[in-house]
């Protein structure tokens, strides 16, 4: 019998033979190739010209500020990770072999806990390293992009900016694939426990980087806009604004380090979910279960090769002025190669036997068309990624109706701007979740009625969404690099003539690519969470020791049909879990947005105090950039703890306090409201931002008009929506799912011991309440600190 503890790390029955070991070897080779290509791109970017002395001076100030922030952030995160690592260790369980594999203990509780804790730490390191590398290169590629534009070369500027992003992309896919490959090669039948630890580490660190970086960047941005644009009437990135360097630093620590880590954990969690579910899924349809384990690795390796080709395919043709066209060509190359490679893998490696099925959805003949089903699930993911991208582009692009409608509403003041942007964001969220629902329905249909195999296809759909992650990360990092390049040129007095045209064009395209990649991350978070939710149900069955009429452990679809594994919302306690889960995204968003608002208030006070005597505007005094950087750094690090505790402790409170069924409903609530809120916040913020840019292009009175001032207020409201709260909901959803998997065995073990349950949930609740109370303190306390 196949062990059912797939998600928690129970023994999985399979044997890696020559073909599977070859796939592991090729997967590792593809990962190493990605890292080598990343290093090659580093060398290529750094050898480019840096421009004038003034440009170098400004770039160095941004580098110093970004590195100082990241160093302090990693130190703070390190202290938080120590107790979390202890939780990972103590929630581990011994792993026993089933009788068919000889019985006995495969790993003791101490061994399992030690190995999983090490995997957790390595996941943290890999995610942090991805963010660090992405940010480090971005703070060096920005000035080189500006220098290339200064030479009048659109082609060179695009290549430098995109290949700077390509460094982060290659290290994201390389480290993610290498980590999973090494864990499977070392632990084999017990690897799923270590993969959960590795994925949890990556997700938790991504949450830290997303929240901390988002607070820093948007506090500086909001403060700079409110005083600079609205009150002083000076343009964005004007060197007279004391917050402008902090604003540019924030682009790197938030949009580069944060997003790179975010996409790393999305990439890793979808891979982990596919690997975890693969063994049981292939066993359920009578195929070699080892194929289900290595197929996701092979598919990821194909995606890595395709991403490398896609990054190098991004080249502007002579006379081409729209950078989005070559970027889309690169993405198309990567997508096409992924489709071709996955088709070959599914049909030639797994096979596609036809047992005479009456139709594609015929559940009675599950051996039919397996290869086609696997290929179809990956393609559905690729299509979903494109649909969500186009949907995001429609609701946030300056050439489409929603943004033009928001821009038109500026004629009647900031209130109507906020109302129209809110409506647009809410509407976009509905369409996004409907698209995801259709994709989930399609993959379930492809499963032919076998629930376990269908859920494996759902995980593969998530993998398909992020198959070209190397290019996706490159696109995202391209945004802040081009934004910084324009800022450096502005502060150095170089943003004019052909240089200005090139950099403004790249910046506009960068805003589009940033918005699009947020759609990728949000959609993949939901797909991955659904797959992990399936693992949660499997773990319940295994921990409860559910058996069929013959006395054998439940397998396949029977696991999901058993009464004990049902999440029944008609049960009041279960429904309470659903309600709490639905509220978490709201609380998390409130914490993040409040932190930005509070910190921005302090930034505004600092900038106003420097402008007060008129010396900066008169040119008799230089602005002091340091205090604003210090304010944003201190505040963002101070605000890290509460969102992290909310993500880790809320599942503990619900699981131990109410029960495992309530925790399952809690996860369902988190997935639903988290997805809706993430899309709403990201798209509303993006629409407000681009409505402002649309007006700055000369519409509705242009810069300096009343309409422009109203648009700036809308953009200011949207900043923490799209760059702090919205994106950080992605790792929040996955962290909570992974925490639930980690603690589920302990919840079931102590479900009849009220003393232990209430002590654990009570202490966790007390810590959580104290943290939330601390986060609600007034601004004055922060100023005093």
Task: Go through the PLM ranges and name each one.
Residues 2-785:
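Hydrophobic packing and interface segments
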